[in-house]
Amino acid sequence: MLLSLAIAGMARELDRDTLLLEDVVVTGTRNSTDIRHLPQTVTVVGRDVLTANEKVNILPTLMEQVPGLMLTSRGVLGYGVSSVCSGGMMLRGISSGSGEVMVLIDGHPQYNGIFGHPIGDSYQTMMAERVEVLRGPASLLYGSNAMGGVVNIVTRRAEQEGHHAYLNLGAGSYGTVQSEAGYTLRSGRFRLLASGQYSRSDNHRPGMGFEQYGGFAKAQYGINSNWNVFADADITHFSASYPGTISAPMLEADQWITRGAVAFGIENNYGTTSGRVSIYDNFGIHKINDGYDALTGTPQSRLFRSKDALMGLSWYQSAMLWSGSRVTVGFDYQNIYGHAYYTSRETGEVLDTPNKQSGEERSHEIAGYVDYRQDVLSMFTIEAGVRYDHHSVAGGEWVPQAGIVVRPLRNGELKLMASKGFRNPTMREMYLYPPSNTDLEPERMWNYEVAWKQRVMSGKLQYGINLFYIDADNIIQTINRQNVNTGELKNKGAEIELQYHIDNHWSISTNHSWLDMCNPVVSAPKYKGYLGATMKHGDWDAVVGITQVCSLYTSIGENPTTEDFTLLNATVSYSLCDKVRLWIKGENLLAQRYEYIAGMPMPKATFMGGINVQF
């Protein structure tokens, strides 16, 4: 309804419309760029939105705010890992669980070196200044695993001069506790930010406990007005238990996971040219008890263990050669390591295992890319780029991309984009377990997209419409007990988003996505919509949001199952003074019965309250 009113009033508003500052993004481009000049579709979720609902993890907020993005969950808190985990992202029907959607931290890849997927419990709100989600392939800049899109976490830094600290505590349903503390220091050219968190929950089913603690730190030093050196580190440890499905309960299915990420680099910015060189490492240590059937099984005599690391070097430089131009060249190197093995529960010794159940491998990727963007007559922007990526086992891959932005109105843009994405086979697919196959080739995908975005009412209301078509082949599937490149994927759909800043007290936002899949996949809905409202009045703040999901596939095969549900969430806070704020929130306030994964029902209404103190 709001979208119809905005379009109907468009002609009346054009003459008196004035553009406000647009979001400046770094995802889809290696330099800070006005989003109006990018042919890619990027959704920006700022820290004010990420923290409004008092969530310790960014993923639930992204599911609400980003059209086409779906997230699986299993309880009040925690996702876990392995085949029984949740926390998987589905973007336009493309799955992060298969390593086809990448998570970045400040542009550095984050995924498991053995299985190729991101780890949902690693992405804590405490580290994020904002999150930029690029819907569609981003392999030109980020290579393998950015086939379906990327979620780039832009980390916080100390902004205010002097010392500052905060403490946020909360507790609620099912023994859930969350806590976070942080400290910032800015003194001259030096900036330091450090934060830590602890959370735990029994969750709503017996045997589904979750506990997590971790920290994030970032230091920066401005050598001069043009050069800056930085270092950051993030580490988290969590333990999670899996109770099985309702019809097939399990015991002792426990996980102990440690994940970390470190980066160090130096960056330059001269206005007409900017760039960065950095080294990074994303690593993990996993210990998993696969558990046993609660009715007929016996305890496991061994534990699965793994160590993995994704180490890399990234360099890029972007320059304006002449008016309206921007060329970016870059080089990437990655060393991908994985070691999977089993140990005895009784003695701890490493076990010899048959059928490729254990293995230790290392692979390398090296890539170079160039991207060129040119503004023409203030009405057009053209962009084209190409990447060559070579994997030590899977071989080389060319990745082209091209797009155009047309601005027929001073407050509106028409975007057309064609981009290729790819994913190299993982260590598991090539070396682990009987279906493994070292002859696998990369998965490949083309995305074709048309988008329109406009701002009206002096920028208070903006909306966007996207139409896309995805054509993927060489998808890795297990056929006759062997992994082979045989699958195809053809998805098409539409997305709509709208934000309306009514006045200083009220604002609303809504987004909707429709997806048509030739081959349905688990956790991908045919429709997802969100409508949210924010109120700020005096010392009171309130956020209310409702999410509608239709035809969500919870299982596929001969007898597929789907879910329809409506989720109502709300958060209210009150400032006792400038330094102290009380908050309370409720989730699934309609007490819906629903599930993301077949046999794993979600909790009904849950509540939590807490306090935030600034020092």
Name every feature range the model reports, one short phrase each.
Residues 201-208, 212, 226-310:
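Flexible loop and strand-edge segments within Gram-negative outer membrane beta-barrel domains
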Residues 224, 319-326, 352-470, 503-505, ...:
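Structural signature of Gram-negative outer-membrane beta-barrels, strongest in the C-terminal barrel
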Residues 138, 150, 155-185, 196, ...:
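Short strand-turn segments of transmembrane beta-barrel domains in outer membranes
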Residues 375-382, 467-471, 485-554, 578-581, ...:
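Gram-negative outer-membrane beta-barrel transporters
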Residues 60-108:
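Extracytoplasmic beta-strand/coil segments of soluble accessory domains associated
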Residues 190, 276-290, 336, 407, ...:
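Membrane-embedded beta-barrel scaffold of Gram-negative outer-membrane proteins
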Residues 108-135:
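Short acidic/polar hinge/loop motifs at secondary-structure boundaries
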Residues 12-51, 59, 465-466:
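Short, acidic, small-residue-rich periplasmic hinge/interaction motif at the N-terminus
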